[in-house]
Amino acid sequence: MKQRFSQVATVIFFVMSIRSPRNLGFFFTLALFVVLVCSQEWFSFEMNRSCSMKVEHRMQFLSTIISEHQKSDVNCWDQIAKKMNVYLFEQKVSGSDVFFLDGADCERFFERNFLRYLPSRKSSHPDLPIAELLPYIRKADIACAGKQLI
């Protein structure tokens, strides 16, 4: 609903700015329109990506993090991203084989969607929607601690 409202608002802004007496310029308005649409798509991608993972997929993600960090490979986040891309594509979580763009994207996903729920960190969501995963998140956090991985 919010996404549809945002798209309608963007189109209305685009039409109004072309017809306004203080015309911003067609190319500037077109560029602004493209930026707004692209940012909405990126935001939608980020929100849908975290919501599409079920508990078993999140458990596999945490398990992969722990096992790859125990190997103490320098580029383990890249390896985690590759393994999870294959797994999530096979499980039909993702319509493409690129759920994570690279290791840095994979690590950011872990920080945003898992580490922020640890009680020792400041949480923006006090209701902890993934409370059953907290022990595994702690293990993954401990496995990652003290290593420069990217």
From Swiss-Prot:
InterPro entries in the cross-refs: DUP/COS
Entry keyword set: Signal
This protein's record includes keyword Signal: yes
Secretion signal span: 1-39
Domain of life: Eukaryota
Pfam families to which the protein is assigned, alphabetical: DUP
GO terms for cellular component: endoplasmic reticulum; fungal-type vacuole
Identification of the protein by name: Putative uncharacterized protein YHL042W
